[in-house]
Amino acid sequence: MDHTDNELQGTNSSGSLGGLDVRRRIPIKLISKQANKAKPAPRTQRTINRMPAKAPPGDEEGFDYNEEERYDCKGGELFANQRRFPGHLFWDFQINILGEKDDTPVHFCDKCGLPIKIYGRMIPCKHVFCYDCAILHEKKGDKMCPGCSDPVQRIEQCTRGSLFMCSIVQGCKRTYLSQRDLQAHINHRHMRAGKPVTRASLENVHPPIAPPPTEIPERFIMPPDKHHMSHIPPKQHIMMPPPPLQHVPHEHYNQPHEDIRAPPAELSMAPPPPRSVSQETFRISTRKHSNLITVPIQDDSNSGAREPPPPAPAPAHHHPEYQGQPVVSHPHHIMPPQQHYAPPPPPPPPISHPMPHPPQAAGTPHLVYSQAPPPPMTSAPPPITPPPGHIIAQMPPYMNHPPPGPPPPQHGGPPVTAPPPHHYNPNSLPQFTEDQGTLSPPFTQPGGMSPGIWPAPRGPPPPPRLQGPPSQTPLPGPHHPDQTRYRPYYQ
């Protein structure tokens, strides 16, 4: 062992004597190496081994050396730690990040998956990729958009934040240069499905508006009245008050309107026959038409006590149009009688019609009065007591006399009135002449018999038509409501 040790020592330091020197030199070399920071661990071990053998001064030196070594090592360790783990020192401090949030969205290229700083916008399809991918794709000779495979005419270069991408529908990804254009695209392409719904809802809304008129006859009737205003202004005024009564027959309202429109033509055709009595007859006819009760009242005068029964028989005998008409309003009444007379030959059928009408009319007119103005019935009885002829004769004079003043302005037009008189001339005048030829003078003479009898038979009509007759005392109770209704229109 010793020999081998000596050999080893000799090899190391060329002699056993030099072994100590070698050992001494080793630490020096190690120190030099320590300066180089090569092997700190073996030095410590060797110094520890040398400590007991060395003298106290050697110990002091070793201590000093150790202190330096430790110092050096500590320094080295600190630097090494800083280099290896710099975070340990700096992460102990609070860091304030300065800057502002950027609201500009960042889009990613569908080709390379990287965020796009400069867009390559395909022109007609408006899809975007990063400019590099777009140029590469174009250089390859592909004139198709990689996203939608649409042909590409050119590529636009756009900066980040200058494009607005559609994200309403996943996969659209079309880009626009302004928010307005993007919104227009959304409304045109993506909201189209919703638009039909809105349009349908609007259409549904409009139809309901039309039905209400049918449901509310008053509204539905009002427009026709306006149309008729030009032809029959007074009748229109009269129609305004009665609408509340018109609730009963909706279908009848529609029919009367049509009838009203149709008869005027017939009436216009009819005027030529008798114009001599056109004014008087016209006025009488208009009043009769407006009330429609005048003809039945005449018949009623013949049948003294029909007032109570009329309500019941009226529905059965009366034509649906007639019933609806009385309820509708005076204008309707005026027109329907014309219709009844107009369809048949003016002279002959009218006469026959009034004749059958008395029973029917007796019921119907009363029904009309019961529905709209019952007073005529009550007022009619006193005049009914006198001979029917007187009532009939008185009726025409009343009609003739008052119309000259107030009615002409109300009716405002002979054209409409002319046709009814023709129809009525055969009906009313022949009847009057047939019943009592002597009574015809009273008709012409409004002062004689007319004043007393006018109120009774024509009670219901005058309130709407003539201010004078209704004002007369004979018809105070029943007619006052009607007068209140119609006065505003005439005044």
Curated annotation (Swiss-Prot):
A zinc finger (RING-type) spans 109-149. It catalyses: S-ubiquitinyl-[E2 ubiquitin-conjugating enzyme]-L-cysteine + [acceptor protein]-L-lysine = [E2 ubiquitin-conjugating enzyme]-L-cysteine + N(6)-ubiquitinyl-[acceptor protein]-L-lysine. Residues 1-61, 255-491 are annotated as: Disordered. Keywords: Cytoplasm, Developmental protein, Metal-binding, Nucleus, Phosphoprotein, Transferase, Ubl conjugation pathway, Zinc, Zinc-finger. SUPFAM superfamilies: RING/U-box. Phosphorylated on tyrosine residues. Gene3D superfamilies: 6.10.140.2210, Zinc/RING finger domain, C3HC4 (zinc finger). It is an enzyme of class 2 (transferase). Pfam families: zf_Hakai (PF18408). A zinc finger (C2H2-type) spans 164-190. It comes from the Eukaryota. The keyword Amino-acid biosynthesis does not apply. Residues 342-359, 372-389, 399-423, 457-478 have a biased composition (Pro residues). One of its GO terms (biological process) is protein ubiquitination. Residues 427-442 have a biased composition (Polar residues). GO terms for cellular component: cytoplasm; cytosol; nuclear speck; nucleus; RNA N6-methyladenosine methyltransferase complex; ubiquitin ligase complex. Homodimer. Interacts with tyrosine-phosphorylated SRC substrates. Component of the WMM complex, a N6-methyltransferase complex composed of a catalytic subcomplex, named MAC, and of an associated subcomplex, named MACOM. The MAC subcomplex is composed of METTL3 and METTL14. The MACOM subcomplex is composed of WTAP, ZC3H13, CBLL1/HAKAI, VIRMA, and, in some cases of RBM15 (RBM15 or RBM15B). Also a component of a MACOM-like complex, named WTAP complex, composed of WTAP, ZC3H13, CBLL1, VIRMA, RBM15, BCLAF1 and THRAP3. PANTHER family: E3 UBIQUITIN-PROTEIN LIGASE HAKAI, E3 UBIQUITIN-PROTEIN LIGASE HAKAI-RELATED. This is E3 ubiquitin-protein ligase Hakai. It comes from Homo sapiens.
